[in-house]
């Protein structure tokens, strides 16, 4: 049998017994009779004398008329005398009647006072000693077991009802002798005193503590009925801890007492048998004494102690074996009263005995006079209770037990009560959810105890709407720090979880500050969401707004689509009637620290109002909790908050805002004390239950040695021996201190995992990035397509997944798919530093690589973001990855893609290909082999760096973006902010991925939402639609750790590479470090043009055409390849011209060109200034002879027919050594402008040192002014711009910038010619 713990409250004050006295007034007295005859005679004598004289006067005349007149005079005289006497008598009677009336009226007023006092006296006595028929109602009231051993009326029991003196003393007046009193008034006084001095049928009680033995006799039925009534009152008002009621009866009479086995007062406190606690009903006093043991063994004689022993024992002896050496059969035991129904116990001390004679109508107290004769004193009518009535009361009391924390002298609200005690759960370690979650009556639905009220009764919070008998669906809880608010919320949520299944009730638990209020509840299947730590992550508040708003909409749509139900109540009613509808649990939202939430996000109040308005019908209940509540915070919401809980507040004003009174401010400081207010009911004071305290150690289900076998047995009074079996040695339990676990932890662990999974209202925030294998269809190797999602419909269609999109309103997270097949084919990624831009690019590349073959997509990467893209270089889809310092590869990459664009523009036109979609289709079907490329992606990580360091490439990439999309050329760019892209290219980026920006104001999605993208969360960003997303990790091993990302990418690249056996992405062709001269076009292929190398853009030959541009300049550091270039040019001249066509003169102070010309082409070689001057004079003379005369025709100028001879090539090496103050070449300066006409060519190579100043040297200045081609090789950038707009910088040997007026500036690699 389950038990119910009773925490006894402070005893209520009974009705007051009237006190005092009433002094009655004396009745009126009879008036005294006045006997003044002589005075009356004297008063009437003159009248009589006069009348007699008149009579005698008329009689003397003996006339008849006169005789009549005399008689009339005599008659009138006697009439006057009689009238006077009558008048005096009437006045006396009138006064006496008035006095009588006044006295009777006075007695009537006193009678009202006396009757009121009698009523109060009856109420007071019946409060303390109710009739047996009313005791059943006391069991379910706060008065159960209200009397404590320290109370004056402890162990006082009613035995019947009889007359008693009026509590207000009626004091009769002192009067004259009765014969002097007005008879009627005196009689009324006597009757008044006789009627009201006693009050009939008042409860008659005896104190069991005052007697060692009570011996009732008389009519057996009446005796048993009275004793049963006596026991019933004793059991109803006294707890089992204070009173024991035991029976010693013969077997024949034991059936009279079988009902007492249900009384908790008749159960042994520590001994158990097979049926439970041993029943204290025996057949002998010796056996009873052995069962009671020390409780009575060590007690003294009756009355020896001034403080009675506890607990008090009432022993009923009805036959049985009463041994004379029994302690109970002695003269009396302290704190023990024996009711002997059969005289089985020897009579000893008459002074401590009470004899009663009981008849069906009267009960008498029996005493003996000195002669030993019985003297009977009636006390009233005996109480009677049948066995059925007694057993009914006993069964009511059977489950109740006193709480161990009961402190009679203390306020019931001062102790802690566990939730399991309120729910009548004995062992929290052995919970059965199937039993706990059994269907509950509608009255108990959403109704749970949360603590004890001031009367010690469980206080239940009912969050149903008032129309269903509840307190309302929405409430408010305010409590200062240390008031126990968090504990109350935990208690409420845990109580609801223990009594309602997840099919009936779900929770959304929100803690704005991120405290531990709801910590540990994640395992409950009731919990749809636990949201904490919003204070530090305010963007999550908006996410919660969307989630809760979405849940309201979802419920509305579900009710409408399921059958257009008006409310959840109608929906559940249809389910119960058999409609095939899924469960739709009630949702209870508990929000702690809501006041601070509203301070941070005032707009959230609109959602609260919406829930308050629609939640009743949708089954969404709301409890708002906070430490403080400012006036005005609840504006618009307070009308929806039907119940309010006020724990101890910081101020009286806060208490008034919540409860309307300042009482919550005056609560004691101990946690859990509070007030509950709902509807128009008065405030209810309560103490919340405690669930965070340690729970008793889990009871051992198996132990070493004998174990009692559980059986189903009849519940009898006799001892039932348990069936014992031997148990094997138990396994050694792990050393675990169960007492360190809290009740909360134990219950949550017991309930975790039971019930259906709840609907997820709040998905976890985007904190843990997914991996690509989690977002893509199943991946596997394919012979035709490599490692991919083979067979998936979107494979190979330029779709890529790059992350997860958070849709809190829809309560789901979707893969973030990009469609790059159409106008959104260019991608821009913007985000502040360390926001995950490079990872986004890697994810995009990897995702496309997993869904396309290397023949379908190719990637060419410019990595200015720290080298992270280098990890993808081994992908078969990646043609090149160039880092910031790899300038050659960067330029070549852009040049290659640009060349591909130009090639496709030409091919598409020639072959009639109208779009890239057609091109893809033709390649896929094999109708067109193509150019070896598919969709080509030029990826630039950190666009600003490219603009700053490679400004010339910006225009090229802009052109690629403007023209390339229609030809399968895509650009993917990243930057720190959108403003770093010029408008010309930013508008072309059809797919924009916006990560966290340094300044949300620059967002191109939504500035307000951009501010909510969390900081220090790489990969978080906004979609075009304003949804938050999280970038996926570019790996396929399921590992979300950032620490192992490099290894994960390497594994992914290796997996993709090993699964592909076809051609890979064409690599970027680079300028060779060494270009053999033999690879240049021959004279037959190039004519008179002299090839000196190949350019970077197209890797095509670069020529010097001296017919067009007669001069050539070379600037370069030592050992950069200047002399090699001069040898190469010289060899080209010799190869293309005969000695008759061209002659060579060398000025070479360092003698590096001694062996260059071994043919007849060389006509001069100067290694010194003197030799050079001599040669220059000769050259000048020869050239001046070729100057055109003034009369030449245009045709002659074009054909140069006015002179004959060879072209003269003057080759100068180390010009810085030549161009001194006595420059031997200076005389030629005036001939340079006409050099083309006269066949003079200067080829000058100069060191880079001082080249900036050398530009103003006359010969170089004149050549530069003529826009002659030149080559700037490796040098120091401090020299400034030398040719065109080229500043020198470090370059490999043989490499330089070829500056020409027609083709602009090109980077070329000059050919190497072996000496």
Swiss-Prot record:
Result after altering residue 1208 to T: No longer interacts with EsxB
Biased composition (Basic residues): 1-11
Main location: membrane
Subcellular location: Cell membrane
Membrane topology: Multi-pass membrane protein
Stretches for region Disordered: 1-21
Binding site for ATP 2: 834-839, 1031
GO cellular component: plasma membrane
Binding residues for ATP 1: 479-486
Region (Binds EsxB): 721-1315
Keywords: ATP-binding, Cell membrane, Membrane, Nucleotide-binding, Repeat, Transmembrane, Transmembrane helix, Transport
UniProt-listed Pfam families: FtsK_SpoIIIE (PF01580)
Extracellular side: 62-64
Binding-site list for ATP 3: 1119-1124, 1293, 1310-1311
Catalytic residues (UniProt): 593
UniProt-reported outcome of changing residue 593 to Q: No longer activates ATPase
Molecular function terms, GO-annotated: ATP binding; ATP hydrolysis activity; DNA binding
InterPro entries in alphabetical order: AAA+_ATPase, EccCa-like_Actinobacteria, EccCb-like_Actinobacteria, FtsK/SpoIIIE/SftA, FtsK_dom, P-loop_NTPase
Residue spans crossing the bilayer: 41-61, 65-85
Function of the protein: Part of the ESX specialized secretion system, which exports proteins from the cell including EsxA (ESAT-6) and EsxB (CFP-10). Has weak intrinsic ATPase activity; probably only the first FtsK domain can hydrolyze ATP. Might be the translocase subunit.
Description of its domains: The cytoplasmic domain is a rigid structure with 4 domains (residues 276 to 401 form an unnamed domain) plus the 3 FtsK (ATPase) domains which are connected by short linkers. Binds EsxB via a small pocket (residues 1163-1208) in the third FtsK (ATPase) domain; the linkers between FtsK 1-2 and FtsK 2-3 bind in an analogous manner to FtsK 1 and FtsK 2. Linker 2 binding to FtsK 1 decreases its ATPase activity and probably controls it.
NCBIfam families xrefs: T7SS_EccC_a, T7SS_EccC_b
Oligomeric and partner information: The cytosolic domain can form homodimers. Binds EsxB, which leads to multimerization, however EsxA disassembles the multimers, possibly by making EccC-EsxA-EsxB trimers instead of EccC-EsxB-EsxB-EccC tetramers. Forms a complex with EsxA and EsxB, probably wholly mediated by EsxB.
Protein name according to UniProt: ESX secretion system protein EccC
Gene it is expressed from: eccC
């Amino acid at each position: 049998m389950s038990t119910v713990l009773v925490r006894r409250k402070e005893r209520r004050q009974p009705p007051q017994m009237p006190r005092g006295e009433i002094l009655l007034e004396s009745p009126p007295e009879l008036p005294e009779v006045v006997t003044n005859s002589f005075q009356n005679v004297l008063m009437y004598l003159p009248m009589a004398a006069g009348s007699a004289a008149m009579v005698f006067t008329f009689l003397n005349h003996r006339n008849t008329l006169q005789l009549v007149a005399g008689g009339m005079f005599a008659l009138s005289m006697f009439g006057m005398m009689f009238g006077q006497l009558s008048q005096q008598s009437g006045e006396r009677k009138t006064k006496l009647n008035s006095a009588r009336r006044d006295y009777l009226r006075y007695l009537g007023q006193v009678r009202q006072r006396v009757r009121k006092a009698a009523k109060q006296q009856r109420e007071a006595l019946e409060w303390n000693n109710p009739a047996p028929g009313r005791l059943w109602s006391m069991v379910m009231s706060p008065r159960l077991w209200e009397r404590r051993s320290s109370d004056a009326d402890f162990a006082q029991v009613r035995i019947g009802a009889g007359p008693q003196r009026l509590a207000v003393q009626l004091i009769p007046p002192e009067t004259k002798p009765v014969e002097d009193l007005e008879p009627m008034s005196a009689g009324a006084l006597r009757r008044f005193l006789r009627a009201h001095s006693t009050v009939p049928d008042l409860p008659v009680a005896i104190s069991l503590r005052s007697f060692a033995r009570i011996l009732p006799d008389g009519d057996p039925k009446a005796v048993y009925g009275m004793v049963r009534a006596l026991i019933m009152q004793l059991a109803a008002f006294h707890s089992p801890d204070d009173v024991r009621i035991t029976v010693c009866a013969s077997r024949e009479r034991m059936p009279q007492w079988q009902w007492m086995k249900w009384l908790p007062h008749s159960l042994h406190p520590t001994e158990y048998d097979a049926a439970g606690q041993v029943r204290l009903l025996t057949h002998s006093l010796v056996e009873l004494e052995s069962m009671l043991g020390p409780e009575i063994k060590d007690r003294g004689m009756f009355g020896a102690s001034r403080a009675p022993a506890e607990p008090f024992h009432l022993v009923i002896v009805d036959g049985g074996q009463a041994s004379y050496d029994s302690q109970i059969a002695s003269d009396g035991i302290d704190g023990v009263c024996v009711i002997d129904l059969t005289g089985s116990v020897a009579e000893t001390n008459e002074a401590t005995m009470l004899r009663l004679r009981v008849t069906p109508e009267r009960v008498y107290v029996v005493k003996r006079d000195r002669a030993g004769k019985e003297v009977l004193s009636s006390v009233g009518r005996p109480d009677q209770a049948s066995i059925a009535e007694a057993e009914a009361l006993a069964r009511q009391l059977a489950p109740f037990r006193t709480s161990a924390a009961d402190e009679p002298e203390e306020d019931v609200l001062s102790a802690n009560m566990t939730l399991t005690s309120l729910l009548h759960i004995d062992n929290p370690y052995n919970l059965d959810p199937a039993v706990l979650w059994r269907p509950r009556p509608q009255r108990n639905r959403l109704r749970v105890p949360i603590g004890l009220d001031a009367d010690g009764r469980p206080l239940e919070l009912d969050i149903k709407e008032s129309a269903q008998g509840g307190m309302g669906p929405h409430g408010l809880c305010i409590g200062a720090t240390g008031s126990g608010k968090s504990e109350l919320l935990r208690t409420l949520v845990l109580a609801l979880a223990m009594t309602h299944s997840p099919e009936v009730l779900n929770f959304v638990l929100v803690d704005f500050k991120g405290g531990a209020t709801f910590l540990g509840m994640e395992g409950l299947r009731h919990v749809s969401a636990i949201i904490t730590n919003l204070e530090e992550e305010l963007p999550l508040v908006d996410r919660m707004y969307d989630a809760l708003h979405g849940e309201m909409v979802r419920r509305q749509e579900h009710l409408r689509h399921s059958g257009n139900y008006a409310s959840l109540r109608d929906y559940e009613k249809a389910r119960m009637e058999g409609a095939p509808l899924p469960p739709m649990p009630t949702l209870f939202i508990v929000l702690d620290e809501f006041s601070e939430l509203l301070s941070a996000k005032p707009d959230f109040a609109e959602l609260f109002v919406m829930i308050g308005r629609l939640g009743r019908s949708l089954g969404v209940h709301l409890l708002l909790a906070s430490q403080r509540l400012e006036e005005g915070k609840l504006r618009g919401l307070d009308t929806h908050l039907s119940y309010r809980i006020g724990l101890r507040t910081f101020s009286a004003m806060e208490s008034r805002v919540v409860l309307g009174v300042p009482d919550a401010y005056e609560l004691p400081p101990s946690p859990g004390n509070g007030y509950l207010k709902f509807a128009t009911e008065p405030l209810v004071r309560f103490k919340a239950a405690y669930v965070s305290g340690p729970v008793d150690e889990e009871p051992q289900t198996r132990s070493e040695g004998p174990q009692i076998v559980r059986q189903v047995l009849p519940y009898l009074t006799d001892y039932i021996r348990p069936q014992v079996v031997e148990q094997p040695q138990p396994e050694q339990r792990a050393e675990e201190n169960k007492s360190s676990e809290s009740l909360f932890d134990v219950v949550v662990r017991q309930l975790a995992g039971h019930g259906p999974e709840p609907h997820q209202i709040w998905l976890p925030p985007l904190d843990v990035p997914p991996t690509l294998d989690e977002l893509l269809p199943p991946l596997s190797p394919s012979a035709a397509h490599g490692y991919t999602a083979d067979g998936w419909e979107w494979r190979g269609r330029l779709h890529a997944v790059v992350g997860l999109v958070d849709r809190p309103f829809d309560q789901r997270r979707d893969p973030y798919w990009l469609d790059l097949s159409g106008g959104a084919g260019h991608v821009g990624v913007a985000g502040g530093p360390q926001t995950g831009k490079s990872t986004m690019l890697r994810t995009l590349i990897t995702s496309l690589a997993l869904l396309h073959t290397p023949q379908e997509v190719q990637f060419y990467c410019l990595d200015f973001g720290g080298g992270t893209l280098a990890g993808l270089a081994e992908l078969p889809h990646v043609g090149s990855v160039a880092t910031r310092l790899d300038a050659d590869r960067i330029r070549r990459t852009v040049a290659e893609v640009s060349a591909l664009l130009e090639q496709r523009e030409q091919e598409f036109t020639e072959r009639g290909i109208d779009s890239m979609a057609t091109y893809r289709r033709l390649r896929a079907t094999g109708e067109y082999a193509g150019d070896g490329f598919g969709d080509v992606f030029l990826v630039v990580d950190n666009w600003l760096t490219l603009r700053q360091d490679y400004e010339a490439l910006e225009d090229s990439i802009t052109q690629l973006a403007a023209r390339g999309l229609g030809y399968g050329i895509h650009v993917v760019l990243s930057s720190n902010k959108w403003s770093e892209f010029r408008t010309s290219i930013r508008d072309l980026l059809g797919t924009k991925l916006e990560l966290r920006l340094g300044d949300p104001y620059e967002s191109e999605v939504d500035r307000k939402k951009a501010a909510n993208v969390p900081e220090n969360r790489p990969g978080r960003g906004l979609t075009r639609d304003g949804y938050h997303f999280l970038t996926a990790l570019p790996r396929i091993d399921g590992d979300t750790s950032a620490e192992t990302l490099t290894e994960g990418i390497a594994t992914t690249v290796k997996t993709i590479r090993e699964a592909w056996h076809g051609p890979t992405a064409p690599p970027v062709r680079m300028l060779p470090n060494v270009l053999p001269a033999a690879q240049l076009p021959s004279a037959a292929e190039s004519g008179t043009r002299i090839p000196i190398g190949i350019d970077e853009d197209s890797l095509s030959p670069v020529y010097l055409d001296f017919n067009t541009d007669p001069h050539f300049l070379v600037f370069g550091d030592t050992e950069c390849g200047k002399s090699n270039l001069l040898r190469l040019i010289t060899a080209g001249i010799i190869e293309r011209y005969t000695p008759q066509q061209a002659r060579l003169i060398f000025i070479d102070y360092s003698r590096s060109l001694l062996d260059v010309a071994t043919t007849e082409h060389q006509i001069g070689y100067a290694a010194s200034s003197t030799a050079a001057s001599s040669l220059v004079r000769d050259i000048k003379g020869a050239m001046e002879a070729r100057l055109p005369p003034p009369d030449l025709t245009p045709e002659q100028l074009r054909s140069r027919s006015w002179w004959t001879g060879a072209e003269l090539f003057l080759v100068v090496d180390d010009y810085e050594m030549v161009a001194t103050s006595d420059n031997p070449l200076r005389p030629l300066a005036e001939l340079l402008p006409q050099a083309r006409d006269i066949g003079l060519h200067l080829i000058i190579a100069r060191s880079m040192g001082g080249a900036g100043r050398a530009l103003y040297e006359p010969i170089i200045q004149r050549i530069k002014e003529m826009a002659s081609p030149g080559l700037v090789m490796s040098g120091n950038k401090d020299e400034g711009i030398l040719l065109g707009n080229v500043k020198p910088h470090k370059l490999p040997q043989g490499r330089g910038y070829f500056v020409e007026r027609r083709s602009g500036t090109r980077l070329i690699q000059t050919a190497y010619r072996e000496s």
